[in-house]
Amino acid sequence: MTPAELFGEGINLMLSGMGFVITFLLILIWAITTMSKLINRFFPEPVKQSKPSQKPTALSAAVQGNDLDRLRPVIVAAIAHHRRSQGLN
């Protein structure tokens, strides 16, 4: 075989391989989409009942503020530890 024939066979093999891969991927996408639609049709997600929204009260705001006050020293210590370990201070 001449180099031109070998090159032509290589191109032919490459294109047929790419065609098979694209065909397989398209079939795979179609199968996954079809299975998803079937599962959603026969096993729909239950509809959750929405609870009436509760307005934040003074107590919940105080608890959130208290959480921030408790976490502030922890955050400062973590930042200081990180800076020490990185040699930034």
UniProtKB/Swiss-Prot annotation:
GO CC aspect terms: plasma membrane
Molecular function (Gene Ontology), one example: oxaloacetate decarboxylase activity
Transmembrane is among the record's keywords: yes
Keyword line: Cell membrane, Ion transport, Membrane, Sodium, Sodium transport, Translocase, Transmembrane, Transmembrane helix, Transport
KW Lipid biosynthesis (keyword) present: no
InterPro entries: Na_pump_deCOase (IPR005899), OadG (IPR023424)
Domain of life (superkingdom): Bacteria
Reactions listed under catalytic activity: oxaloacetate + 2 Na(+)(in) + H(+) = pyruvate + 2 Na(+)(out) + CO2
Quaternary structure (record): Heterotrimer of an alpha, a beta and a gamma subunit.
Protein's name according to its UniProt entry: Probable oxaloacetate decarboxylase gamma chain
Organism of derivation: Actinobacillus succinogenes (strain ATCC 55618 / DSM 22257 / CCUG 43843 / 130Z)
Gene that this sequence comes from: oadG
